[in-house]
Amino acid sequence: MKKQYFCNPLNMDYRYQFIQDMRSGEDKISREAADPSMILFQGKYYIFASMTLSVWVSEDMVHWESHRLPDSLPLYDYAPDVRVVGDYVYFSASRRGTICDFYRTKDILNGLFERIPGTFDFWDPNLFLDDDGKLYFYWGCNNVTPIWGVELEPETMVPKTERKELIYGQPEKIGYERVGENHSKMPLSEEEAVEKFKEFLKAQGKDADHLTEEQIGFAKIMFSQRPFIEGAWMTKHDGTYYLQYAGPGTEYNVYGDGVYESDSPLGPFRLAKNNPYSYKPGGFLRGAGHGSTMEDRYGNWWHTATMQISKNHDMERRVGIWRAGFDKDGVLFCNQQFGDWPMAVEQAKEDPWAEPEWYLLSYQKAMTASSSEEGREPSFATDENIQTWWRAAGNQPGEWISMDLGEVKDVRAVQINFADDKIDAPLPGERQGERYIDPSQHKTRWLLEASADGTNYFVLADKSDAETNLPHDFVVKEEGVQIRYLKLTVFEVPYNQNPCISGLRVFGFGNGEKPSAPQYQAERTGTMDMRIIIEPQTDAVGYNVLWGFAPDKLYHSCMTFMPEQNIGALVEGETVYVRVDAFNENGITEGSVRPLA
């Protein structure tokens, strides 16, 4: 079977939202899809994600199509959960203070969704069918309350047991549960949280000396710097129950999924040795939290999760997919070492640790453009950071951005990442609460040309007449194209905004040798922190820092382009082993493994 390729984030039509700011009353406009539930049902793969109004469908895990879901479903409710139960797919979503219903169908794309009246409210639901036919339900999304679990009556979906507290956040001991960029903030005491809230009120010119009980309760939750423990997903493998959960917050680069294990679906649960299970704090697009784990038709395991942009709004997010699995010792892992590089997929059993076939060629390459705004120069399109971008000075068709690779290289793929910036558009419809999701079919149209000499250009891909709106389009030239220059001309983007490119990313093969093995130091800087210092080397573009609880289980990784990297995701008291790999345009070279002192 011929290989096919994709590159995270998934290249889908992420719908725009108009979210009313409670302070200013103005709308913040951004795209979002998050909290994905992925299933295999009747031979096809389906992803249900928050705020998409749709389900994404694929035959091969590479090419996805979006299909509108019926308005009878709670499409404005976060974290849709789907599970296959017999001939049915069951659907539920999140709402606080209102009873949440269940829905089921035998035909996702064409069938009716039968409503099953609910009996309680929940947030971040997850349904799980055990081998013995018993049905369990998990939910929770809070920095005070736990992840809950209960057994349900299969016909009525009414709880058969009392809800049970399963897991709580422990940021004092579990490093990856701490909030902030790179886990930079420790939790506060209740007294400290209240004082911080008072400072906030004073800065707003409001009374901070006479707090109500309600305000004090609010402060203890929202100003505590405690993690939100959320996004449960249960997987059973060889008799062990793996309760996955997300934290510490979707707006951070360290949003990831941890995992607990048990011999029973309702616990007691023990923290797994391999944590965090899904974790991507570095690279072009960061974050890999609140997701789901699924086995495909060929016995390969996959994990899909939420990736963070959070520039136009905290909830500006995307969806990624990575290989996952269980090792010979039953350890659940997810491979995110090069998690936003092109990934090959074959319709067969595959190696979850296969290295990338192509390498990054575009990092910090020379860029020019038809125009740009100050602070949004074309160089931001090659800095491997989706949170920065080139923005043209105008919005007329024909604005362009161009890259010089430095010399002719063997190019195999190009990813074109569009950003949004300062969208000024009228509200297209009526809000539901604070939000309106735009169902319109916008268009993103462009032309990608290439040249070996800078004079004679040929078309690499033409979407100048496209009827689609794909912000992370991916062009594959599997046989290779010998080029030095690329030019992207933009003809249309949504809402007639100025075109913005956060990443014109090129992959293939350079003309040199792999980098030498990196020399590095690894030192503990706290019970949950370590610092990696790498000796700079001219033959490396960047590095991957790997770590794990055994020399042969280095399942966590952080990509960096700097010679120093802090890692705050350690678990107190756990043994840690480290390795640093170097990469450039020609390959990847592994470093030595050593214990963290």
Model-identified regions with their sequence ranges:
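Short beta-strand elements bearing conserved aromatic residues within extracellular beta-rich modules
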Residues: 150, 446-448, 543-545
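Extracellular low-complexity, O-glycosylation-prone stalks/linkers
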Residues: 538-561
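Aromatic, loop-rich ligand-recognition surfaces of beta-strand-rich domains
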Residues: 383-459, 470-520, 524-527, 535, ...
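Short, solvent-exposed loop/turn segments in extracellular or other extracytoplasmic domains
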Residues: 466-473, 559-566
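Beta-strand-rich modules
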Residues: 567-590
